[in-house]
A protein has these predicted regions:
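Flexible, glycine/charged-enriched surface loops at secondary-structure junctions
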Residues: 35-42, 57-60, 262-276, 297, ...
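Phosphate/diphosphate-binding glycine-rich loops and adjacent basic-rich segments that engage nucleotide
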Residues: 157-227
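Catalytic-core signal marking the mid-to-C-terminal active-site face
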Residues: 2-9, 13-18, 22-25, 255, ...
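Alpha-helix boundary/capping motif
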Residues: 289-295, 305-312
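Internal helical hairpin/lid segments
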Residues: 232-288
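Active-site cofactor/substrate anionic-group-binding motifs, chiefly glycine-
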Residues: 58-112
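A generic, well-ordered mixed alpha/beta core segment in the N-terminal half of proteins
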Residues: 90-180
Length: 317
């Protein structure tokens, strides 16, 4: 999902690097902290692409989290995913307590083949760790001509509508669809009001958040990101009066990415503790090949309409 490179002012002592250079540097960092070459390459590509596309909360900001989980032994950086060909339209991968992205990489070819043969296929990843951007998981499928939809649950850090205790993860959804003559249509969004990483960035910078984003440890609304991180929780997306929408979608993802595939819910995995012990969770990815209608043509038309929908004074980036 490439975005135009913004102009970034820099001073003496700093320098700009290309995405390829950043990816190579990150690969070396992961290798030095004990991952296999395969795992290092996949994680570096994910972080570099997020940084390139402007998602700072999921780019190099995530590196300390990756390294702390490796140093503590909580995640196995040498894990070799076990791919199971379960049924004509179903693939299961045991990530073996490794990161989810290498597990997806190991099963991608089989999932694409099944989707093309059967029109649709589902991939379930169990026993994995995933706290990166989700769109890099789905975009490659769209570039192969498939429609892809992914769900993942995470650490319990979101209060359901009307509740007072963190029950859900940020539980993102990612979608990608091919377009003739252009980049795929891709989105990746949390079902919380804001990504957890963005709260961490706001706290570091001393910024406040808009109303309706979180609560403190007493369940009271707060705009202070530090209070949210210090025993508080995020709220579902939807705003002060419609957060039930985000809460409902998050419930769905808990079930789809948890017990439906034999894995844990966010609550079962344990709440985020601010340290290296990030939770294990499940990850679902659905690939679909549409052969009965001019899907690509419709996608081009819709993409064109979306691009020209904003007011000229507020264009898309």
């Amino acid at each position: 999902m490439p975005a135009p490179t913004p102009h970034i002012p820099h001073s003496a002592g700093t320098s700009l690097v290309s995405c390829a250079e950043l990816q190579a540097l990150l690969t070396q960092i992961f290798l030095r902290h004990g991952t296999s070459a395969e795992v290092a390459a996949v994680l570096a590509a994910n972080c570099a692409s997020a940084q390139r596309d402007g998602a700072e909360s999921h780019g190099i900001f995530r590196i300390p989290g990756y390294l702390s989980t490796l140093a503590s032994g909580w995640v196995n950086g040498q894990a070799v995913p076990q791919v199971q060909d379960v049924a004509p339209g179903y693939v299961v991968v045991d990530a073996c307590n490794g990161f989810a992205q290498p597990a997806l990489q190991a099963a991608r070819g089989l999932l694409i083949d099944k989707a093309r043969r059967n029109g649709i296929a589902l991939l379930a990843i169990r026993n994995s760790h995933h706290f990166a951007a989700l769109w890099p998981d789905v975009e490659p499928f769209a570039r192969e001509g498939l429609v892809a939809l992914a769900f993942v649950n995470s650490m319990a850090c979101v209060v359901p509508t009307g509740g007072h205790k963190a029950l859900f993860g940020t539980n993102p959804i990612a979608f990608a669809a091919p377009r003739t003559g252009g980049d795929p249509l891709v989105f990746d969004l949390a079902t919380s009001a804001i990504a957890h990483g963005d709260v961490q960035i706001a706290a570091r910078a001393g910024h406040t958040l808009p109303e309706g984003y979180g609560v403190d440890r007493h369940g009271q609304p707060t705009c202070d990101p530090a209070a949210i991180l210090d025993g508080g929780a995020l709220l579902p997306f939807g705003g002060l009066h419609s957060s039930y929408k985000g809460s409902a979608l998050s419930t769905m993802i808990e079930l789809i990415a948890g017990p439906l595939i034999g894995d844990l819910t966010s609550l079962e995995s344990g709440a985020f503790d601010g340290g290296a012990n990030l939770v294990r969770h499940g990850h679902d990815l659905l690939g679909h090949v549409q052969q009965d209608v001019d899907f690509l043509g419709v996608g081009v038309a819709l993409g064109h309409a979306l691009h020209h929908a904003p007011h000229p004074a507020r264009p898309f980036a």
